[in-house]
Amino acid sequence: MGQAVAAYLHFLSIFVLFALLVLEHRLFKLPLDLERARSLVRIDIAYGLAAGVVLLTGLARVVWYGKGLDYYLHNSMFHAKMGLFALIALFSGFPTFVFLNWRNALKAGRVPEVSPGKAKAVIMVIRLELLLVLLLPLFAVLMARGYGVMGN
């Protein structure tokens, strides 16, 4: 039963993560208004929490369920998937820092100022994250089918 719950929570958190990223992409456009700016901050926090749940449930599946830790540690698709997840996490830092820099303006009830160049960069990073998140299931499927097993 634990394996099913861990798998369900893992998949659900991935769907939530993707939905939040799509929502971020949809809401981030100039000119910003106060309500959308506040929503973007909240959505980004939820996105970070969803990423944490993805990571924790994924680790639970690797350590306690699935094919055993040894299988995953000796599978290049697993390493590619983890590397891709880490890369997505690094990219997500840019929009997060932009949103965190809005705190003072939002506390003062002001709309944050965002240059067109910075807005374009944030949008491009979010689009890149969306693309990379779509590659994660490819590595998962290949790994589950036995591709990438290193040495015997």
Task: Describe these PLM feature segments.
Residues 1-152:
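Polytopic transmembrane helical bundles with strong interfacial aromatic enrichment
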